């Protein structure tokens, strides 16, 4: 929108504004690189291929962002007011209540993207909205029954036990925002209960590390149970999970590949389409004692989906790698 000339305000929660400052510049850079690659290899139907937006557009967009607090009712246009409520999905996510005056009187529209799971860690339950004249709601899993959370957690713990007993590494491809922080919290719970055998846990994603720091700055938004649990460790994630190490630079990431067993490695991208996880897969997929835990949605055509579907071989960084690890 900004690239096309939008100059109005962009209302969001303060946590969303901070996450945008992490995610959008990287996205703009990727847009530019993909357009340059398409032009160099002449495979785009556009002449020339152009990025949807650039890093410069991102900076202009960030300058338009105006953070507002949950529950704060504010005017957005003549006769139109809005209010953000916690959607409980990721830190800063919001349900939008919108009131507008029209020829048929005042109407209320409620809009939301993803809503959080009632039993998810860290985030509170989604806010309950009492009424609406019009509701627009994301519904990806609207027609599905999921197994209980406890079954999932039990399976997660069992896989970690098997990997530790077998001497292999555990690779967890994870999205930088939301899922990585949930995994660290669950690992912390296991550690505090004396159930985590691994002595090395790596969060090998600069973006996930930055997102985790946003979570820490906004931990007042966590649910009461998570606040109480983390509070017993002084609110410090690395005190809650002492084996945790943040790997910020390339050299530290490369050093992990010398570890052949006993480590849990969390890295992006979540669908294994890029990022540091591809290097870790290259060094571990062919090991029969290694485990890969898929913790998020995997789109068709992605390496992550290929693993879920039982691929016996995967091409990573230009090399065919046999899949002998347990997925």
Give the ranges of each region predicted by the language model.
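His/Asp/Glu-rich metal-coordinating catalytic cores
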Residues: 1-182, 188-195, 200
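Short, conserved active-site loop motifs that form the nucleotide-linked donor/cofactor pocket
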Residues: 65, 80, 244-245, 263, ...
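Basic, gly/Ser/Thr/Pro-rich low-complexity segments located predominantly at protein N termini
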Residues: 93, 97, 118, 147, ...
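Short, basic, glycine/proline-bearing loop/turn elements
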Residues: 108-109, 139-145, 237-241, 262-268, ...
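Hard-cation-handling environments
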Residues: 159-303, 315
């Amino acid at each position: 929108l900004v690239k096309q000339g939008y100059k109005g305000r962009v209302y969001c929660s303060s946590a969303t504004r901070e996450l945008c400052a992490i995610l959008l510049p990287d996205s703009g850079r990727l847009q530019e690189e993909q357009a340059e690659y398409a032009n160099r290899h002449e495979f785009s139907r556009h002449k020339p291929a152009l990025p949807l937006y650039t890093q410069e557009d991102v900076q202009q967009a960030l300058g338009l962002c105006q953070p507002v607090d949950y529950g704060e009712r504010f005017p957005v246009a003549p006769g139109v007011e809005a209010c953000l409520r916690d959607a409980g999905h990721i830190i800063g996510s919001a349900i939008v209540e919108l009131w507008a005056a029209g020829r048929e009187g005042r109407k209320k529209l409620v809009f939301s993207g993803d809503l959080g799971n009632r039993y998810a860690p860290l985030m509170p339950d989604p806010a309950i909205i009492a009424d609406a004249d019009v509701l627009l709601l994301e519904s990806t899993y609207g027609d599905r029954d999921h197994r209980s959370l406890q079954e999932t957690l039990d399976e997660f713990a069992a896989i970690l036990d098997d990997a530790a007993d077998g001497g292999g590494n555990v690779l967890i491809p994870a999205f930088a925002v939301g899922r990585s922080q949930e995994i660290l919290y669950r690992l912390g719970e296991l550690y505090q209960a004396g159930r985590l055998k691994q002595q090395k846990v790596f969060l090998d994603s600069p973006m996930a590390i930055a997102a985790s720091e946003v979570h820490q700055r906004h931990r007042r938004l966590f649910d009461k149970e998570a606040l109480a649990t983390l509070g017993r460790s002084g609110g410090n994630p690395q005190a809650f999970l002492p084996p945790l190490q943040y790997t910020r630079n390339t050299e530290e990431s490369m050093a992990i590949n010398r570890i052949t067993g006993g480590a849990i490695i969390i890295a992006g991208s979540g669908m294994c389409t890029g990022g540091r996880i591809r290097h870790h897969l290259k060094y571990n997929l062919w090991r029969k004692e290694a485990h890969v835990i898929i913790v998020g949605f995997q789109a068709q055509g992605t390496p992550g989906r290929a693993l879920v579907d039982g691929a016996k071989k995967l091409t990573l960084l230009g090399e065919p790698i046999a899949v002998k690890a347990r997925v």
